[in-house]
Design a protein with these regions (language model features):
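Extracytoplasmic soluble-region selector
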Residues: 1-135, 170-172, 178-184, 189
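Short, flexible loop/turn segments at beta-strand junctions in immunoglobulin-like
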Residues: 18, 104, 155, 194-196
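Aromatic/hydrophobic beta-strand junction motif of beta-rich domains
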Residues: 74-78, 151-155, 194
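Short proline/glycine-enriched turn/loop motifs at strand-loop junctions of beta-rich domains
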Residues: 77-83, 155-161, 199-200
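Pro/Thr/Ser/Gly-rich low-complexity, intrinsically disordered linker/stalk tracts
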Residues: 135-155, 220-227
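Solvent-exposed loop/turn segments flanking beta-strands in beta-repeat/beta-sandwich domains
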Residues: 155-169, 176-177
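Beta-strand-rich modules
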Residues: 198-212
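Alpha-helical transmembrane segments and their helix-helix packing motifs
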Residues: 216-217
């Protein structure tokens, strides 16, 4: 039997017919009409009938260059005007307010969880968005001669690592040696010098990395460097 036939009905065979959204209790009875060794019993279950929910997000941007304190709106909404709640997996990278505005706090990765609760008409729904906040560098200069490549990185994100990779060409299929890495400590400039005397042609790629997230890469604007 159903406690609320306006929501759903159930027949003698246990087939449920849904009428509209809401909540109803179904009671299942075993009357022991066959006079077996089993006692009569009943079981009651609660059935919730809900419309499918979806969470829409206006802002599609999920990667940001690090600038502490920058605020952005996620622009999320749910069907039926259901209230949304927000949480961040890493508030040290991105914090999120009750109104859905994120604030950049540091460099790294954070997952923002958006939840629409069950309001009696629409089902509960959860959506997760992964954000990346990239380390930055204000400028990069490349100088070279027949023997050395000198890379100067200005204002890299503190405590990041400056990385210089030297490839055979702009196709970036073959890497010459290991990456050249220097940790950013104090000061606003990092200089890395690479011995390129053995290479007749090469292609440098420069970027910074922190907490597993890489900055945008800088390359030689004129393509391969040839001697």
């Amino acid at each position: 039997t159903s406690s609320n036939e306006n929501v759903l009905k159930v027949n003698d065979r246990g087939v449920i017919t849904v009428t509209k959204t809401g909540t109803a209790k179904i009671t299942i009875c075993a009357n022991n009409k066959t006079k077996s060794n089993y006692k009569p019993c009943s079981k009651t279950i609660t059935v919730k009938v809900r419309k499918p929910q979806s969470i829409q997000v206006k802002s599609k941007k999920t990667q940001y260059n690090y600038k502490k304190g920058v605020k952005r709106s996620i622009g999320a909404s749910a069907k039926g005007g259901v209230r949304l709640t927000y949480s961040s997996s890493n508030p040290k990278v991105i914090s999120v307010a009750n109104n859905g505005k994120i604030t950049i706090k540091g460099v790294g990765k954070a997952i923002v969880t958006i939840k629409a609760g069950d309001n009696g008409v629409y089902e509960q729904k959860v959506r997760k968005i992964t954000y990346y906040v990239r380390p930055v560098m204000s400028s990069v200069s490349i100088a070279h001669n027949s023997k050395t490549l000198k890379v100067t990185v200005n204002n890299p994100t503190p405590n990041s690592k400056v990385i210089v990779k030297v490839y055979e060409s702009s196709k970036m299929k073959k890497l010459y040696g290991k990456p050249h890495i220097k940790t950013v400590k104090k000061g606003k400039k990092v200089v890395i010098t690479v011995n390129v005397s053995k290479y007749s042609r090469y292609y440098p790629v420069i970027y910074v990395k922190k907490n597993g997230v890489e900055s945008q890469k800088v390359t030689n604007s004129r393509g391969d460097i040839r001697k």
